[in-house]
Amino acid sequence: MKHIILFLFVLLALISCVKEEEDSPLLSAPVITLKEESPIYKTKIGREITIAPIYENTDSETTFNWTIDGKSICTTSTLTFSADEAGRYFILISATNAGGTTEKEIRIDVFQLDVPTISIADADKGFKVLQGSELTITPIVDSFLETSYSWQINGEDISNELTCTLPTIELGEYQVRFATHNEDGDDEVTFKVEVCSPDQVDFNWTFLQTEYNMSAGRTIRIKPVDVNNALDAVYTWTVDNEQVQSGENDTYLFTSEQQGEHTVKVEMKNSYILATQTLKINVCPPAGTYQRKISATSSASMNKVYEYLPAPGQFINENHTTTTMAEACTYAEERINQTAYVSLGGFGGYIIVGFDHSIVNDGDYNIAITGNAFDGSSEPGIVWVMQDENGDGLPNDTWYELRGSEYGKAETWQDYAVTYHKPSGIQLPTPWTDNHGQSGSIDYLGAFHRQDYYYPAWVKEKQYTLRGTRLKERNYDQSGNGTYWVNDSYEWGYADNFSAIDRLTDDDNYNAGPSDNHFKISHAVTFDGKDANLKYIDFIKVQVGVNSKSGWLGEISTEVFGIKDFNMLK
């Protein structure tokens, strides 16, 4: 009996000991372990993400708190998080028991939804095409995600590819729908296509100017651009009411020794329509009449910006508010006076400057244009020069290209034109089309330049066209994976170009500082490639000469820091 009583006493003591151990507080703080290797999580706006750490040394009395900037957002062991705004969110996890408190910080990066937004140039106006012609459309779709495409005509599926050639066999009006879809959303654009017979299509042509100024004895080329649906056109030209040319040729070469105003009229007639355009030609005194001699007060640097019209680009509209051409010129002038860069955007973007004197052609280098090229980073600009032939102090006379190493090559395109279309919304790529049937976009680089539009704010129209000489691009992805791009150089004759010839220095410009290229007025050529034989010039234009982009670096864009009369510096 005593043995039984002793056994019960020991058993009760053991049970009491276990109970006391279960009720005793934990002697060490919690341990927080994340399931993921990195404390950085990623999600998108409006998407929930759940974070469930592994905890040790916790019991029913352990408390949890998740905070952002000291403000509690959750008090359970697991966090389900979502945000309505993109950004980085730093969150502190704390777990507390009787043994202490442990904290661990995580980061959640919330990104914008990558909805496949569509841009189709001129879709808002629709398309009017000639029966049997080809209408191929390649939309710009802004998305890095895998995206599906769908084309429909009058509700019937016709293609699942990005590029679509629409049928134009049957006359009539068609409703076309292009749609995109990915995991983040959808977009669609609908537009009208009218397939017309020859008598229904619109004839279009554009004259870049209707008034010309030229020195007596010179020859200028008069030619419409963007000619559409001419069909069996015959062009008839008259000068001062006298017919001088008639035929299929839409170009007329005007020359005269007779000073004064002359009237040129061109008539386009085909089987369906008659169109006319009247032009005024001012034949001015011989070259040299209005040359301005250098004086003791003359400055080597340009003294006025007459026009600044860049193509869309990542530096356009950045850190300044400009809504008129006059304001744009003032902005560019102030930048150049500080030897700060003026970006010309993508292909065709340009700046026109003048001087307080004429720059003389001495057969050697006469002009210095400052860029910031270095080995592997050339963004070549075509250089044009002009004399003030009518003496009014304005750049409204004849432009002459300064030929460079690529002039005359088959791969160099003269009279190239790119039309830029204002994006349909903010922070989107800027679509473009060209006069060679190509299309593309100036990318929006939100990681670096977050202004709403790369499209110049002082261009009020929804589209504008820039023209000039186009060099074949030389940029390439050296890394093979998009991380290291090279914008290779050209031999000579271009602004912002790492030339071994016309930089006149062996400095490698490793830090991309302002650096000059040099130019000879004796390299000026006429429209047909002949020597212009200019004895001096008054105005200079620099125009972006390449239409290309280099991955994350963006569009190839000539930068100008200064333009100088090199005769005064050498």
Whereabouts are the PLM-identified features?
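A short beta-strand segment in extracellular, disulfide-stabilized domains
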Residues: 46-57, 131-141, 216-227
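Solvent-exposed loop segments of extracellular immunoglobulin-like
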Residues: 57-65, 143-150, 228-236
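Acidic, glycine-anchored loop motifs typical of Ca2+
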Residues: 389-398, 420
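Bacterial Sec-dependent N-terminal signal peptides
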Residues: 1-45, 98-119, 183-192, 196-197
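Surface-exposed, flexible coil segments in extracellular/virion-facing regions
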Residues: 65-82, 150-167, 238-254
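A domain-level signal for the mature, folded cores of soluble proteins
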Residues: 204, 278-379, 403-570
